[in-house]
């Protein structure tokens, strides 16, 4: 028993007792079945940088297997301004290593980030993920260095203005 895995804050890592990089479709299905997960979310970035979400209510095992295997079709022309309507059939396929239990969902929900693929099953060359991957490889080839970056997450709390906690706008990036 590996204590690092058992004590991991990612509930899937603790339950499956393996690191995220080793998650398989069967692992995800087992976690969903044994933990009462009722919804699966596929999350993917659009051209505007916003994270889009597809929600799937899990009503049977065949459906779960189908969405985990084949992903879901999305309209690329509504996601990216450079994709023409005539060639806009894209698929979002889940990356199992990104699976996490959504702490904000009202019903038990498992979320995963997705990759874009074209109608022929090939990675979408112009997707943000693939473009970054190609840039990292080129950077490494030219410099011999490895490119590492982390995203900046921003959360917004939207509620009626009650004037209870007034703040002055400081116009600084630290705020």
Pin down the residues of each PLM region.
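ATP/Mg2+-dependent ligation/transfer catalytic cores
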Residues: 1-174
